[in-house]
A protein has these predicted regions:
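Short, contiguous alpha-helical
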Residues: 1-5, 43-94, 130-173
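Short acidic/polar alpha-helix capping motifs at helix-coil junctions
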Residues: 7-12, 22-23, 37-39, 82, ...
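Acidic/His metal-coordination segments adjacent to aromatic residues that form catalytic metal sites
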Residues: 15-19, 92-107, 139-147
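Hydrophobic alpha-helical segments and helix-packing faces
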Residues: 20, 27, 52-56, 63, ...
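A broad, low-specificity signal for short, low-complexity segments enriched in glycine/proline
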Residues: 20-22, 80, 121-122
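Hydrophobic packing residues in well-ordered alpha-helices of helical domains and bundles
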Residues: 24-27, 56, 104-111, 146, ...
């Protein structure tokens, strides 16, 4: 994932079209729809539709972890000069079994909490802080901004909402 792409190849998301004032509403709406997909799936949300595709619960846990990580990146970039974020090791978390105890009900609550914390951070960000620079993670060399991280949070939620909706379609046949 480049730090400043024009559009996501997978979902068509355009980072430049996310205004910081619109981001909280878009994030909240995507997460609400995400949780609805999780609730509709029930225990079937624990099942992978194929070995190479995550389950709905795994996607939900990934989004939870990504939002928590982005919140920390925003806070650190607000208080230090050009910090470098830590990768979240998304694939490794799954491969090492860190999601195996997640249940649909618990991961839904955890996603709601993570979203609420990030939304509070977005809504209380001091004026002028959207342009503060940071290195998104050690996997990237170019600086980006807090505004981009906020847009990326929206992208994560909207993109993976598409993934869980597809899982639902695959489950229903």
């Amino acid at each position: 994932m480049p730090v400043d792409p024009v559009a996501c190849e997978g979902c068509g998301f355009l980072w430049a079209e996310v205004e910081p004032d619109d981001a909280p509403g878009r994030l909240a709406a995507a997460v609400a729809a995400f949780i609805e997909q999780l609730e509709v799936a029930g225990d079937a949300g624990l099942l992978r539709p194929s070995p190479e595709r995550w389950s709905i619960v795994e996607y939900t846990g990934h989004l939870r972890d990504a939002l928590l990580s982005m919140r920390e990146r925003i806070i650190v970039a607000s208080v230090t000069e050009l910090p470098t974020g830590t990768p979240i090791y998304r694939e490794e978390r799954i491969e090492l079994g860190f999601a195996r105890l997640d249940t649909p009900a618990e991961v839904a609550v955890e996603l709601e909490v993570a979203t609420g914390l990030l939304l509070k951070t977005m809504l209380t960000l001091p004026d002028g802080f959207h342009d503060r620079p940071l290195i998104y993670s050690s996997n990237f060399s170019s600086p980006t901004t807090i505004a981009w991280v906020i847009a990326q949070a929206v992208h994560e939620a909207e993109h993976h909402l598409g993934d869980v909706a597809e899982n639902g379609r695959l489950r229903r046949g």
